[in-house]
Amino acid sequence: MADSASESDTDAAGGGPAAMQSSCSATSGGSGGGGGGKSGGIVISPFRLEELTNRLASLQQENKVLKIELETYKLKCKALQEENRDLRKASVTIQARAEQEEEFISNTLFKKIQALQKEKETLAVNYEKEEEFLTNELSRKLMQLQHEKAELEQHLEQEQEFQVNKLMKKIKKLENDTISKQLTLEQLRREKIDLENTLEQEQEALVNRLWKRMDKLEAEKRILQEKLDQPVSAPPSPRDISMEIDSPENMMRHIRFLKNEVERLKKQLRAAQLQHSEKMAQYLEEERHMREENLRLQRKLQREMERREALCRQLSESESSLEMDDERYFNEMSAQGLRPRTVSSPIPYTPSPSSSRPISPGLSYASHTVGFTPPTSLTRAGMSYYNSPGLHVQHMGASHGITRPSPRRSSSPDKFKRPTPPPSPNTQSPVQPPPPPPPPPMQPAVPSAAPTQPAPTQPQHPVHPSSQP
């Protein structure tokens, strides 16, 4: 834009003298022409001459303005060139500074990378050492856990076997209880069906009675009409009434009679409905009582079962404690039962150290009870059943004459009672159905009295037969 302005200024400046020369030539030509006009006949008017002078003045003014603009544009161009030079210098300095900063940053990062590599190598070495240590430690713990797992699995199998046997007994008992409850439920259903049939029969009998009364009333009405000498075309009935009556009085009398009859029948119907509603309410009340009784008996049965389970649990705990006491007593007897054998000779017997004769029967227990230990706390419930001291006593034989109380005592029948079957809920019905079959016999496990731990009986001391002299 500045270049085009400068070109226009130069053109205008270059064209200024030419225009002036052309104008001068024109004026001279005009003057000459004036002289020649006089000679040649060409005349320039003064109006045209004034117009040309005005145009020349305007062109000169425009030329001055364009020259001023050219000067301003030249100044602007110089300022822009200086500014461009300054910007180039600033860019060179900024680039040099950026290169210095980049080199400094690269050096610092290289140092940090070297430090991190060294730290990484040290960490790798430490990690390998720690990993090796942890691997050895974990392998040792794994072997220990495997041994413990094998032992626990063995104990668990024994406990599971004991629990399975116990649960099988409980399942059999529950199956027997379920069968008895199903039989009771079937009996209640049959009783309900019988009650419904009885109710239907009573309703049918009531309807038949009402129909008989209606027939009887129709017959009485027919007799009364015959007595009054009224023409009876057909026996009037509530279902078939003849509306053809001779006089209005007979009609009114007949209407009053029918109204009275309807009122009486309505009263009978209301009484029958009231009686029926009372019976239904009574039956519903009986059914509600039976349901409540059934629910109460079920809750009582549940409480008895829970109580029986609790007592069985306490009994098993007491049996385990008795077994431990018996084992402890047996160990003490076997360890402290060294006394001389009683002989029949009056001469006192002095055993020699080289004699291989056993001193007393208690001494022979040592070979059997060396490896005997009371059960641990982990398998106290299950192992005591299998490692009971009764097994050692049976192994010793009956020649020693030791009598020990059995750890699993059979309860006497006077301490336990069999649960009686629930009474029939249909106690208010007139017809008593046959009682439900008793539940299958169960093992007595629930004492009737409060759960009391039976006192352990003291085992009898071994009796050694002594011959009289």
Curated annotation (Swiss-Prot):
The gene is Ccdc6. The protein has mostly an alpha helical conformation similar to myosin heavy-chain tail that might adopt a coiled-coil conformation. A motif (SH3-binding) lies at residues 435-444. GO terms for cellular component: cytoskeleton; cytosol. Keywords: Acetylation, Chromosomal rearrangement, Coiled coil, Cytoplasm, Cytoskeleton, Methylation, Phosphoprotein, Repeat, SH3-binding. Residues 419-444 have a biased composition (Pro residues). The modification N-acetylalanine is found at A2. The modification Omega-N-methylarginine is found at R380. Residues 99-228 are annotated as: 5 X 29 AA tandem repeats. InterPro entries: DUF2046. It holds the Pfam family DUF2046. Residues 1-10 have a biased composition (Acidic residues). It comes from Mus musculus (Mouse). PANTHER family: COILED-COIL DOMAIN-CONTAINING PROTEIN 6, H4 D10S170 PROTEIN-RELATED. One of its GO terms (molecular function) is SH3 domain binding. The modification Phosphoserine is found at S45, S233, S237, S242, S247, S277, S316, S356, S360, S388, S406. Sequence repeats lie at residues 99-127, 128-156, 157-185, 186-199, 200-228. Residues 1-37, 335-362, 394-469 are annotated as: Disordered. This is Coiled-coil domain-containing protein 6. It is found in: Cytoplasm; Cytoplasm, Cytoskeleton. The modification Phosphothreonine is found at T342. Residues 344-361, 460-469 have a biased composition (Low complexity). Residues 47-320 form a coiled coil.
